[in-house]
């Protein structure tokens, strides 16, 4: 069983690997579109970059701090998808001056993926320092808030639609120990994006912005290997969050604007919940359940 598969969920089917419905029949038209991914050089972010490249976007921009992983990601993407332009920006998402400059230099962006996150030491809350907590909130919440604001102020792309995809975590809603800063900051970030989503619905311009948060899955990384053996759980495939993000960027997901989702949830079952989602503003959001 997958690490979080036993958690309550709105769908019967729980995917640990990608599947044709989102990998081949996602409904997203990448023609002429530009995608900006923070943290897109490795891990989940790179999985998302590959999926959008496969979907035929014209340009993928990657923002991260380290040059070497960026160059490796660029080389891999251009080798596999020679028609896709890959642009690199070496910067920290916490730089509230540089990030708006990057948006200006890049031009209109169709899809913004908030993929950078800070994860502190896996220690009890009493052992985590104030600075570690601040670092988590500075990157996971404040930087996401500032970049979302800056993106909303940019001109609409030719497609007439902006999409913001926030890479969240199960830690935002599932009780996990030794994750005081990470879990609480991810929950706060999801709440921030929910506020943006509700306010965008009230804009008189027909809501040309769609906003989603989603848990990408559980992956066997070197950090995870310090606490679990590989055979202890069934780990998710990194292709899953990439293809799920592309599906979110397509037209079928519009009714899920402002919701907190999991890549593991079956998209056809989610579509079957459309009326409930539209009627219950709190359904699939981060908040108090009574």
Swiss-Prot record:
Its EC number is 1.1.1.-. Pathway: Secondary metabolite biosynthesis. It comes from the Eukaryota. Gene3D superfamilies: NAD(P)-binding Rossmann-like Domain. GO terms for molecular function: oxidoreductase activity. Keywords: NADP, Oxidoreductase. InterPro entries: NAD(P)-bd_dom_sf (IPR036291), Sc_DH/Rdtase_CS (IPR020904), SDR_fam (IPR002347). The active site is at residues 168, 182, 186. GO terms for biological process: secondary metabolite biosynthetic process. NADP(+) binds at residues 37, 149, 182, 186, 221. Signal peptide: none annotated. Disruption phenotype: Impairs the production of neosartorin but accumulates no metabolites related to the neosartorin pathway. CDD domains: SDR_c. Belongs to the short-chain dehydrogenases/reductases (SDR) family. Short chain dehydrogenase/reductase; part of the gene cluster that mediates the biosynthesis of the tetrahydroxanthone dimer neosartorin, which exhibits antibacterial activity. The two different monomeric units appear to be synthesized by the same set of enzymes, among which the Baeyer-Villiger monooxygenase nsrF is the key enzyme for the divergence of the biosynthetic routes. The pathway begins with the synthesis of atrochrysone thioester by the polyketide synthase nsrB. This is Short chain dehydrogenase/reductase nsrO. It comes from Aspergillus novofumigatus (strain IBT 16806). The gene is nsrO.
């Amino acid at each position: 069983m997958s690490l979080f598969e036993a958690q309550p969920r709105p769908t019967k089917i729980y995917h640990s690997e990608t599947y044709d419905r989102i990998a081949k029949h996602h409904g997203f038209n990448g023609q002429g579109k530009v995608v900006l991914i923070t943290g897109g050089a490795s891990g989940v972010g790179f999985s998302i970059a590959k999926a959008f490249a496969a979907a035929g976007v014209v340009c993928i921009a990657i923002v991260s701090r380290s040059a070497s992983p960026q160059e490796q990601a660029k080389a891999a993407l251009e080798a596999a998808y020679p028609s896709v332009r890959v642009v690199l920006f070496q910067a920290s998402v916490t730089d509230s001056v540089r990030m708006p400059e990057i948006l200006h230099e890049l031009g209109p962006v169709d899809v913004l993926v908030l993929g950078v996150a800070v994860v502190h030491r896996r220690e009890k809350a009493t052992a985590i320092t104030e600075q570690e907590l601040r670092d988590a909130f500075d990157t996971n919440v404040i930087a996401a808030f500032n970049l979302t604001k800056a993106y909303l102020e940019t001109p609409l792309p030719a497609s007439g639609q902006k999409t913001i995809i926030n890479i969240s975590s199960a830690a935002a809603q599932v009780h996990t120990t030794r994750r005081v800063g990470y879990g609480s900051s991810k929950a706060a970030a999801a709440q921030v994006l929910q506020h943006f989503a509700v306010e965008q619905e009230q804009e008189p311009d027909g809501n040309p912005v769609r906003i989603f948060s989603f848990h990408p899955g559980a992956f066997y990384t070197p950090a995870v290997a310090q606490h679990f053996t590989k055979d202890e759980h069934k780990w998710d495939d990194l292709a899953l969050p990439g293809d799920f993000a592309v599906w979110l960027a397509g037209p079928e997901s519009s009714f899920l604007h402002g919701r907190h989702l999991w890549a593991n949830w079956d998209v056809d079952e989610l579509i079957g919940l459309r009326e409930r989602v539209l009627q219950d503003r709190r359904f699939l959001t981060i908040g108090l359940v009574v």
